[in-house]
Amino acid sequence: MLMPKRVKYRKNHLPHIKGKETRGLKLAFGDYGIQAVGRGYVDSRMIESCRVIMAKNIGKTGKYWIRIFPDVAWTKKPLEVRMGGGKGDPEKWIFPVKPGRIMFELTGVDEDTAKHIARLIGFRLPFEVRLISRV
């Protein structure tokens, strides 16, 4: 699972996910990209399940890139603990996604396979995604 090796601060405020994305809007590596239409937080387990889908469906000739990295700590207090006593411990690592962000890129596959992969990835993310192409 993806997580940072070292962080300056263990606990941080959650970033706002209002508005549209201003970075990561264009394809940088592959011929096809999976772009977020909605907004939400993606954790490292979701990214790993998407990676497994791409690895299984691309084959030996294709290649994929993961353009997001979870570097924000998501904290949670234990169950049945009263309020107060400070912020909870980090539970998982997340990446805030705004509409327009390209999260994954693919190359070496035909358009039907890319559409199939985008559909499968859409089932595993908490917001809507779409396939974009360089052509």
Curated annotation (Swiss-Prot):
CDD domains: Ribosomal_L16_L10e (cd01433). One of its GO terms (molecular function) is structural constituent of ribosome. Keywords: Ribonucleoprotein, Ribosomal protein, RNA-binding, rRNA-binding, tRNA-binding. One of its GO terms (cellular component) is cytosolic large ribosomal subunit. GO terms for biological process: translation. It holds the Pfam family Ribosomal_L16. InterPro entries: Ribosomal_uL16, Ribosomal_uL16_bact-type, Ribosomal_uL16_CS, Ribosomal_uL16_dom, Ribosomal_uL16_sf. It comes from the Bacteria. PROSITE patterns: RIBOSOMAL_L16_2. Part of the 50S ribosomal subunit. Belongs to the universal ribosomal protein uL16 family. Binds 23S rRNA and is also seen to make contacts with the A and possibly P site tRNAs. This is Large ribosomal subunit protein uL16. The gene is rplP.
